[in-house]
């Protein structure tokens, strides 16, 4: 995060915001700047990626599903907008520790004898390490003592859209992001790689809520994609993983996606629409649409 803050200081904070008497390494200034940068970055990343996904990837026919809530998209957005600033507070405390040199983040690839190999290995280890921790944290959030107050708000969205990706209770959102912050305090990681991975995991979080269940056949047994995560939203006790199915298989919580068996929400909506169309046809209303141009859905 120091790379982002350095750029923000150089181009904005130092020349336009803070007085010259307030040095860039002042801890109070750094805290304020990190809060601004973290929140601004989170909102930009969320709205940019979720909006693109919603309009160009998300299957809008899913909005006809009976478990899709009234005004759901706007509710997902409002929930996220309210939660992100609260999530940023503990997040910034960890960024501050990184910024002040308490982590194992490094600048120079040459710090390691096999620098590029180490860099590539660190990417793989980051993904597997964080996937493991997120699995157990996520599964723990389903415990009856904490689920109702902390994790249930995210499960309101049975048929999620990309905008539901960050619609968490603040404690839930921070806990599930915690593994990404723990890693650089335990293992060496290049600063640019860390920043790139941090963006990647947020984009991935959006992608597993996008309703696009296409995964190459050869990867289906290994990748925890949108189909897996949609089943998690619908059935609760399965597919807790973030990227891979490994820990769900080890923990006995893996469920083969119902969508891969023709029993998922897409199939439900398709069958429902066909039945409604046939019903209209039988009543002499074949091809007639109502209201806003869509067939009404069953209550």
Curated annotation (Swiss-Prot):
Which residue ranges traverse the bilayer? 32-52, 79-99, 117-137, 186-206
EC number of the protein: 1.14.19.20
Q: Which Pfam families does the annotation name? A: FA_hydroxylase (PF04116)
Extent of motif Histidine box-2: 151-155
Q: Which InterPro entries match?
A: Fatty_acid_hydroxylase, Sterol_Desaturase_Related
Keyword field contains Lipid metabolism: yes
Q: In which pathway does it act?
A: Steroid biosynthesis; cholesterol biosynthesis
What cofactors does the UniProt entry give for this protein? Fe cation
* Annotated localization: Endoplasmic reticulum membrane
Q: Which reaction does it catalyse?
A: a Delta(7)-sterol + 2 Fe(II)-[cytochrome b5] + O2 + 2 H(+) = a Delta(5),Delta(7)-sterol + 2 Fe(III)-[cytochrome b5] + 2 H2O; lathosterol + 2 Fe(II)-[cytochrome b5] + O2 + 2 H(+) = 7-dehydrocholesterol + 2 Fe(III)-[cytochrome b5] + 2 H2O; 5alpha-cholesta-7,24-dien-3beta-ol + 2 Fe(II)-[cytochrome b5] + O2 + 2 H(+) = 7-dehydrodesmosterol + 2 Fe(III)-[cytochrome b5] + 2 H2O
One cellular component term from this protein's GO annotations in UniProt? endoplasmic reticulum membrane
Q: Which residues carry this modification: Phosphoserine?
A: 253
Q: List where the motif Histidine box-1 lies.
A: 138-143
Q: Region (Disordered): which ranges?
A: 280-299
Name of the top EC class for this enzyme: oxidoreductase
Instruction: Motif Histidine box-3 — list its residue ranges.
Output: 228-233
Q: How does this protein lie in the membrane?
A: Multi-pass membrane protein
- One GO-annotated biological process of the protein: negative regulation of ferroptosis
Keyword terms: Endoplasmic reticulum, Iron, Lipid biosynthesis, Lipid metabolism, Membrane, Oxidoreductase, Phosphoprotein, Steroid biosynthesis, Steroid metabolism, Sterol biosynthesis, Sterol metabolism, Transmembrane, Transmembrane helix
- Biological function: Catalyzes the penultimate step of the biosynthesis of cholesterol, the dehydrogenation of lathosterol into 7-dehydrocholesterol (7-DHC). Cholesterol is the major sterol component in mammalian membranes and a precursor for bile acid and steroid hormone synthesis. In addition to its essential role in cholesterol biosynthesis, it also indirectly regulates ferroptosis through the production of 7-DHC. By diverting the spread of damage caused by peroxyl radicals from the phospholipid components to its sterol nucleus, 7-DHC prevents this form of cell death.
Q: Which family does it belong to?
A: Belongs to the sterol desaturase family.
* This protein's domain notes: The histidine box domains may contain the active site and/or be involved in metal ion binding.
Q: Which PANTHER family does the protein's record reference?
A: STEROL DESATURASE
Name the record gives this protein: Lathosterol oxidase
- The species is Mus musculus (Mouse)
The gene behind this protein is: Sc5d
């Amino acid at each position: 995060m120091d790379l982002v803050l350095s750029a923000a200081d150089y181009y904005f904070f130092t020349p336009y915001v803070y007085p010259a008497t307030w040095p860039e390494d002042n801890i109070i200034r750094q805290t304020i700047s990190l809060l601004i940068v973290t929140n601004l970055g989170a909102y930009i990343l969320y709205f940019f990626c979720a909006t693109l996904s919603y309009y160009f990837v998300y299957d809008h026919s899913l909005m006809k599903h009976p478990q899709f809530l009234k005004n759901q998209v706007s509710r997902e957005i409002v929930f996220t907008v309210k939660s992100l600033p609260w999530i940023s507070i503990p997040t910034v405390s960890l960024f501050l520790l990184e910024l002040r040199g308490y982590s194992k983040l490094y600048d120079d690839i040459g710090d390691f004898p096999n620098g590029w190999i180490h860099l590539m290995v660190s990417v793989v280890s980051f993904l597997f390490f964080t996937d493991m921790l997120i699995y157990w944290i996520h599964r723990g959030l389903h415990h009856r003592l904490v689920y109702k107050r902390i994790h249930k708000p995210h499960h309101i969205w049975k048929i999620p859209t990309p905008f539901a990706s960050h619609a968490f209770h603040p404690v839930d959102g921070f806990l599930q992001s915690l593994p990404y912050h723990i890693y650089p305090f335990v293992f060496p990681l290049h600063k640019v790689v860390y920043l790139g991975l941090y963006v990647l995991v947020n984009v991935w979080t959006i992608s597993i809520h996008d309703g696009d269940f296409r995964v190459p056949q050869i990867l289906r047994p290994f990748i925890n994609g949108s189909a897996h995560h949609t089943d998690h939203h619908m059935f609760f006790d399965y597919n807790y993983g973030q990227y891979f199915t490994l820990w769900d298989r080890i923990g006995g919580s893996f469920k083969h996606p119902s969508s891969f068996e023709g029993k998922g929400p897409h199939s439900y909506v398709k069958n429902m629409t066909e039945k409604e169309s046939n019903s209209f046809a039988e009543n002499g209303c074949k091809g007639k649409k109502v209201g806003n141009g869509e067939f009404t859905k069953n209550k």
